[in-house]
């Protein structure tokens, strides 16, 4: 009976030790895009890719979004544009455009899309995807 408090004390010490030395898991949202930083991709482009991933998950049309590495590295950053688009006149500091691929929800077909992202004060202000259809060759 006298050893019962000793046993509980040891169990409490062991659990507190494990709790205090538990490793913190890294933020998955940052870890997913860490490779882009190592590839020397500009920070606004990385923010746009992350915004597209979040946005596509919520849209009813697409369920998956992929930007190939060479398209991310070749993203066009337009600093001269002051509005996101004529249809959506959000004031922005820069517009980032890159070609990507999106998969239609419920289907297996990947579609080429032109992605545009507006950045204002270092934050993503607007995103848009438009299908990029190859012109048909008429002979």
Region roles according to the model:
Residues 7-15:
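Bacterial N-terminal signal peptides
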Residues 20-139:
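Mitochondrial intermembrane space
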Residues 1-5:
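Positively charged n-region of N-terminal signal peptides that target proteins for export
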